[in-house]
């Protein structure tokens, strides 16, 4: 008997959910590698502002916890890719939890930006200094990396790692004495852009959750079909059945023979 459960859709906004989820997993794997490289560069150049300056072991523990966080994010992304490729829905649960937490943090960031944006526009100043790489190239790389981080589920990770170059507020212009009308326009642009990012995160969560339901439905259907398969037994022929001895329960008398009426 076929399952009566409603079939799960294999598309999400005109995209195949498996392809979209695999692309999302690869995207976050690349982001994990970029975060690792960025953090290694920051540590090597001595630009990581550690909270424990006078305690070497605490400073080392802080750095190790940062690398451990990046490693956990990498494992979660690998788990997502492995679960989709191998059709195992339980490996998608860690990434779903990460997406929910990231969405809530992004929502709080959007609400808190209305408080911290005026202070940012007032205090942010360009930092002059010699550099071997052209300044515009560094700004472009920082901008691209900030946008990639903003659109992923790792948005709040740079805040923990103290990445000043990847702060989500960096793409806003930094100047003092902003007129009121210009400030309103900047806040409007910032709000629209951030709400667009939140909608993108909801869409990514929908893709992963739909893929999770699809894999779970497919695996349950396979288990039901395998459990309903009956064993085929070769029955004896009529002559073989007559030649077999009669089977009577032990201790019970045999049934009376048939007699003509």
Swiss-Prot record:
Expression tissues:
Preferentially expressed in adult hematopoietic tissues. High levels in lymphoid and myeloid tissues.
* Location relative to the cell: Lysosome membrane
This entry's comment on induction and repression of expression is: By retinoic acid. Likely target of the activated retinoic acid receptor alpha.
Q: How does it assemble?
A: Binds to ubiquitin.
Q: Quick one: where is this thing mainly located?
A: membrane
Q: Annotated region Disordered: where?
A: 242-261
Keywords associated with the record: Lysosome, Membrane, Phosphoprotein, Transmembrane, Transmembrane helix, Transport
Q: Note whether Transmembrane helix occurs among the keywords.
A: yes
GO MF assignments: enzyme binding; protein sequestering activity; ubiquitin protein ligase binding
The transmembrane segments are 21-41, 65-85, 92-112, 133-153, 183-203
Topology relative to the membrane, per the entry?
Answer: Multi-pass membrane protein
Which residue positions does Phosphotyrosine occur at?
258
Instruction: Give the protein name, as stated in the record.
Output: Lysosomal-associated transmembrane protein 5
List the Pfam families hit by this protein, alphabetically.
Mtp (PF03821)
Organism from which the protein derives: Mus musculus
